[in-house]
Amino acid sequence: MYAILAEKPSAAKAYAQALNGKRQGRIYVAPPSSLLPEGALICAAVGHILEFLEPGELNEKYKSYSLDSLPIIIDLFQYKVVSDKKEVLQRIKDTIFDKRVKTIILATDAAAEGEYIGRNILYRLQCKKTIKRLWTSSMTATSIQKAFSQLKADAETLPLYYQAKARAESDYMIGLTLSRAYGILLKEQGIVPHNTTISLGRVQTPLLAEIVKRERLIEQFTAENFWTVKATFNNQGNVYEGEWFHEKENRIFKEEQAEQLCELVRNQSSTIMEMKEEMRTYQPPLLYXLSTLQMDAGNAFGFKPAETLKYAQSLYDKGYLSYPRTQDERITESDARELENNIQFLSGHDTFGALFPLPVSTLMNNKRYIGEVTDHHALLITDKIPKDKDLSEDEKSIYHLVVKRILAAHYPDVAMSHKEIITKVMDRFTFRSKGKELLSKGWHHIIPPTNENDIMLPTLLKGSEGVVTDTLTTKSKTKPPNRYTSSSLIGFMKNAAQAIEDEDRKSISNLPLGTEATRAGLITLLESRKYIEWKKNKVYPTLLGITVVDSIKRGSVIKSPILTAKWDVKLNEIGASLYNHKDFIAHSKKLSSVLFEEVKTYSSTWNQNGVERIKSESIGACLLCGSNVVLRKGKHGEFYGCSNYKDSGCTFNLPFKVLNKKLSKKQLMELLKNEKTDIIKGFKWKDKTFNAPLVWNREDQKVQFGK
């Protein structure tokens, strides 16, 4: 008999359905079949159910939050069960050690991280049974059954475990060492408040540095006025417009010069110097990888990357989409054959049925879409087609994007005619006219462009003459670089080569920051650390984010994507059995020590380099000692307390919640100012709900309910 270990309950359910299994208690039982002749027990983790032991649990010296305990170097990582996941691990243990089970099928996600999650559990339980690996990018019954018929040998995917292990352990040591070091030093020098959480990391810090760099460019930008000049021409009855240009410049930075140009050319004769006309074709876009889906969803719906991943993951869990955390935009011939079958199920769909029959019936033999893929092919629909009413609005938005992308690939190229006329006036001044005309709509039937209006130009003879009948100047301003949006931030992370110095950029043309699976989480992490904030889908660094970046030495590898580039090369080599994971971890330990020494030395220059100090925002005066009441951090989370607690031992604090009622900042400020609040609605005690003000009892020195 087999025991199947899934990464999450939804996957276990999908496996059970594909194998005609039934639920028995907290697991599924699949009957004997041609795929699994002895049947199977199916259990599930819930993602990561194990976590590293804290450094202080491994070594007493690391319990001390001091520079003397750094860097954190761990020779043998050990794991503990996540506090609320003990029951899950016990259920897995009971399943795989069932006396009937002879072979374990590791069926976690088909990627390095899935390998890491699954094998950590098996190693923790000291499982010595035979292991087989299930590898599938789709959760449809057909794909699952096919994967069970082609189980991989244990050794075939083991290198992916070492790849993920090397990354996790190295990131942990470097991240924790630097987070502690910078946190201690920034707080010691009074640059950040003592309740501030400071974190640095190989990927999060270069991303934050880029956001801060863009903000600085915007702040330092000085807008300039400029003018453009347009002329209207009449060439033997053919009227058209052109814009002045000289070499590559079409802007004039002095108004009087623009006006003079208008006066000079008005009513003057003109000559056609060049007349170009060509037909261009535009291929349909490639299929979606996660990043390109996140970019389009951000532009179309304002979704943050984490939201797009959430909805795509939900569609995958329900069996409507293939595995979403993919970096590939192509598919294999086998995938194309399956897609050819699945796409026909859309012909009866309320939204997409009218688009059938498709002009191109198959993607087979189309090298633009068909080729080798890495772990997972591009995002595809499955043979399970949902009705719009079965999806939430957000899920529907994502599903429709993916479907349209696939359908567009089954339409011909867009064909457009482009014209360009270069007109010369007074044998001195040149004007450019550009026109376009849609000849064949092609895949724009499926994905219309934002602006498809034709700009018609006449066909004129080179050397033919006309006259300038009118001129117009238009005033504009130079614009700073755009702030990053959720979409453009993902675009930057797909290739961060632009962020590195010119001499290094020559050798690195493609530099991804993070992976398809981690990018959304990295952006969310910066937000949770209060390093960035969002305003109308644009990202801004906070003062804390700027301070952290400024505290890092210029040129430090922790602030540059170069480190990630080098790591990715080696990590991929580990996954391909071309490099030893132990050598990688040894190098990471040395780097952790180097970066720790770097911050110790550089921190002495923070004052002279103008690293900005951040003061805690006060919400009022302490009712015991009169000092500021600020947001602080304790063992059980954040709370408002006296800022003078270290010097005077003042213990004053205010609760965030009273009887399950969350108090607003405004209510807490009112309490500090007036020693009472207005009536607050919604307190709950046992089965009753009541309304009451909060008051400060001076005698007992505590907050209580008033009348």
Swiss-Prot record:
A single GO BP: DNA repair
GO (cellular component) term, any one: cytoplasmic replication fork
Domain Topo IA-type catalytic: 157-596
InterPro entries, per database record: Topo_IA (IPR000380), Topo_IA_2 (IPR003601), Topo_IA_AS (IPR023406), Topo_IA_cen (IPR013497), Topo_IA_cen_sub1 (IPR013824), Topo_IA_cen_sub2 (IPR013825), Topo_IA_cen_sub3 (IPR013826), Topo_IA_core_domain (IPR023405)
Span list, region Interaction with DNA: 199-204
Native organism: Alkalihalophilus pseudofirmus (strain ATCC BAA-2126 / JCM 17055 / OF4) (Bacillus pseudofirmus)
Keyword Isomerase annotated: yes
One Pfam family here: Topoisom_bac
Gene giving rise to this polypeptide: topA
Catalytic activity, reaction form: ATP-independent breakage of single-stranded DNA, followed by passage and rejoining
Function as written in the Swiss-Prot or TrEMBL entry: Releases the supercoiling and torsional tension of DNA, which is introduced during the DNA replication and transcription, by transiently cleaving and rejoining one strand of the DNA duplex. Introduces a single-strand break via transesterification at a target site in duplex DNA. The scissile phosphodiester is attacked by the catalytic tyrosine of the enzyme, resulting in the formation of a DNA-(5'-phosphotyrosyl)-enzyme intermediate and the expulsion of a 3'-OH DNA strand. The free DNA strand then undergoes passage around the unbroken strand, thus removing DNA supercoils.
Entry's EC annotation: 5.6.2.1
Stored SMART domains: TOP1Ac (SM00437), TOP1Bc (SM00436), TOPRIM (SM00493)
Domain of life: Bacteria
Name of this chain's protein: DNA topoisomerase 1
Keyword Iron included in the entry's annotation: no
Limits of the Toprim domain: 1-140
Family label: Belongs to the type IA topoisomerase family.
Subunit structure: Monomer.
Annotated catalytic residues: 323 (o-(5'-phospho-dna)-tyrosine intermediate)
